[in-house]
Amino acid sequence: VAARPTPPLPTPVPIIDLPQTIPTAAPQADPAARIEIPELGIDLQVVPGDGVNAPYYKAAEYPAPFKLPGQGGRSMIYAHAQKGMFGPLFNGKVGQHVDVTLASGRELHYAIREYYAHWPVDDLRWFQPGDHEQLLLVTCTTYNPNDPRIVAVAEPV
Protein backbone atom coordinates (compact mmCIF):
# COMPACT_ATOMS: atom_id res chain seq x y z
CA VAL A 1 0.00 0.00 0.00
CA ALA A 2 1.43 3.30 -1.03
CA ALA A 3 1.40 6.19 1.46
CA ARG A 4 -0.67 9.13 0.47
CA PRO A 5 0.74 12.61 0.86
CA THR A 6 -0.74 14.63 3.72
CA PRO A 7 -3.03 17.32 2.36
CA PRO A 8 -1.91 20.89 3.13
CA LEU A 9 -3.61 22.64 6.05
CA PRO A 10 -5.97 25.45 5.11
CA THR A 11 -4.66 28.98 5.48
CA PRO A 12 -6.27 30.60 8.54
CA VAL A 13 -8.64 33.42 7.73
CA PRO A 14 -9.65 35.93 10.40
CA ILE A 15 -13.28 35.78 11.45
CA ILE A 16 -13.40 39.58 11.47
CA ASP A 17 -11.03 41.42 9.20
CA LEU A 18 -9.63 44.12 11.50
CA PRO A 19 -6.72 46.33 10.54
CA GLN A 20 -3.52 45.08 12.08
CA THR A 21 -2.01 47.40 14.65
CA ILE A 22 1.52 47.22 15.80
CA PRO A 23 1.74 47.82 19.53
CA THR A 24 3.98 50.66 20.51
CA ALA A 25 6.06 50.67 23.62
CA ALA A 26 4.73 52.58 26.58
CA PRO A 27 6.58 55.81 27.30
CA GLN A 28 9.69 55.11 29.29
CA ALA A 29 9.54 56.19 32.90
CA ASP A 30 12.11 58.80 33.80
CA PRO A 31 12.13 58.84 37.59
CA ALA A 32 13.79 61.43 39.76
CA ALA A 33 17.38 60.59 40.69
CA ARG A 34 18.31 63.62 42.82
CA ILE A 35 16.60 66.49 44.61
CA GLU A 36 18.30 69.70 45.71
CA ILE A 37 16.99 72.68 47.65
CA PRO A 38 20.04 74.97 47.66
CA GLU A 39 18.67 77.50 50.17
CA LEU A 40 18.20 74.69 52.72
CA GLY A 41 21.33 72.68 51.94
CA ILE A 42 19.26 69.67 50.86
CA ASP A 43 20.94 67.41 48.30
CA LEU A 44 19.61 63.84 48.25
CA GLN A 45 19.48 60.84 46.00
CA VAL A 46 15.87 59.92 45.12
CA VAL A 47 14.77 56.28 45.00
CA PRO A 48 11.42 54.61 44.27
CA GLY A 49 9.22 54.56 47.36
CA ASP A 50 6.38 52.46 48.68
CA GLY A 51 4.49 55.35 50.29
CA VAL A 52 5.09 53.98 53.78
CA ASN A 53 8.78 53.68 54.52
CA ALA A 54 11.27 56.47 54.07
CA PRO A 55 14.84 55.34 53.39
CA TYR A 56 17.66 56.79 55.47
CA TYR A 57 19.82 59.44 53.78
CA LYS A 58 17.73 59.30 50.61
CA ALA A 59 14.41 60.70 49.47
CA ALA A 60 11.67 58.57 47.95
CA GLU A 61 9.12 59.11 45.19
CA TYR A 62 5.57 58.30 46.23
CA PRO A 63 4.04 55.62 44.00
CA ALA A 64 0.71 55.78 42.13
CA PRO A 65 -1.62 57.62 42.04
CA PHE A 66 1.14 60.21 41.80
CA LYS A 67 2.99 60.91 38.58
CA LEU A 68 6.73 61.21 38.23
CA PRO A 69 8.18 64.73 38.25
CA GLY A 70 7.97 66.23 34.78
CA GLN A 71 4.95 64.15 33.71
CA GLY A 72 2.50 67.02 34.03
CA GLY A 73 0.63 66.18 37.21
CA ARG A 74 1.11 65.94 40.94
CA SER A 75 4.21 64.11 42.18
CA MET A 76 5.49 63.62 45.71
CA ILE A 77 8.94 63.15 47.20
CA TYR A 78 9.28 62.36 50.89
CA ALA A 79 12.14 61.86 53.33
CA HIS A 80 12.85 61.70 57.06
CA ALA A 81 12.89 64.98 58.99
CA GLN A 82 16.48 64.56 60.07
CA LYS A 83 19.79 66.24 59.40
CA GLY A 84 21.12 65.18 56.01
CA MET A 85 17.59 64.47 54.77
CA PHE A 86 14.45 66.68 54.86
CA GLY A 87 15.15 68.05 58.37
CA PRO A 88 16.02 71.48 56.92
CA LEU A 89 12.49 71.61 55.45
CA PHE A 90 11.44 72.89 58.91
CA ASN A 91 12.92 76.19 57.63
CA GLY A 92 11.20 76.02 54.26
CA LYS A 93 9.74 79.18 52.77
CA VAL A 94 7.69 80.20 49.78
CA GLY A 95 10.01 81.17 46.93
CA GLN A 96 12.81 78.69 47.68
CA HIS A 97 14.12 76.79 44.66
CA VAL A 98 13.83 73.03 44.20
CA ASP A 99 15.91 71.30 41.53
CA VAL A 100 15.18 67.73 40.45
CA THR A 101 17.50 65.73 38.20
CA LEU A 102 15.83 62.82 36.44
CA ALA A 103 17.51 59.49 35.73
CA SER A 104 18.00 60.61 32.11
CA GLY A 105 19.97 63.66 33.30
CA ARG A 106 17.15 66.07 32.45
CA GLU A 107 16.83 68.85 35.02
CA LEU A 108 13.55 70.25 36.33
CA HIS A 109 13.33 73.52 38.23
CA TYR A 110 10.59 74.40 40.71
CA ALA A 111 9.89 77.03 43.35
CA ILE A 112 7.94 76.50 46.57
CA ARG A 113 4.55 78.21 46.11
CA GLU A 114 2.84 76.99 49.31
CA TYR A 115 4.32 75.91 52.64
CA TYR A 116 2.49 74.23 55.53
CA ALA A 117 4.39 73.65 58.77
CA HIS A 118 1.58 71.65 60.45
CA TRP A 119 -0.48 69.88 57.78
CA PRO A 120 -3.04 67.54 59.46
CA VAL A 121 -2.15 63.93 58.71
CA ASP A 122 -5.83 63.10 58.07
CA ASP A 123 -6.27 65.85 55.44
CA LEU A 124 -5.71 63.92 52.23
CA ARG A 125 -6.38 66.66 49.68
CA TRP A 126 -2.80 66.45 48.39
CA PHE A 127 -3.34 62.77 47.60
CA GLN A 128 -5.80 63.65 44.84
CA PRO A 129 -4.65 63.86 41.22
CA GLY A 130 -3.47 67.32 40.21
CA ASP A 131 -4.53 69.21 37.11
CA HIS A 132 -1.08 70.73 36.53
CA GLU A 133 2.58 70.07 37.33
CA GLN A 134 3.20 70.16 41.09
CA LEU A 135 5.91 68.63 43.25
CA LEU A 136 4.96 67.92 46.86
CA LEU A 137 7.74 67.66 49.43
CA VAL A 138 6.63 65.91 52.60
CA THR A 139 8.27 65.12 55.93
CA CYS A 140 7.18 64.40 59.50
CA THR A 141 7.17 66.87 62.37
CA THR A 142 7.67 64.24 65.12
CA TYR A 143 8.15 60.50 65.49
CA ASN A 144 4.39 60.04 66.02
CA PRO A 145 2.78 58.96 62.72
CA ASN A 146 -0.47 60.71 63.74
CA ASP A 147 1.12 64.14 64.14
CA PRO A 148 1.00 66.84 61.44
CA ARG A 149 3.36 66.84 58.48
CA ILE A 150 5.36 69.53 56.75
CA VAL A 151 4.13 69.93 53.19
CA ALA A 152 5.80 72.18 50.63
CA VAL A 153 4.08 72.56 47.26
CA ALA A 154 6.47 73.48 44.44
CA GLU A 155 5.60 74.39 40.87
CA PRO A 156 7.75 74.74 37.74
CA VAL A 157 9.59 78.01 37.16
Where are the regions that the model predicts?
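Solvent-exposed, non-transmembrane regions of membrane-associated and secreted proteins
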Residues: V1-V157
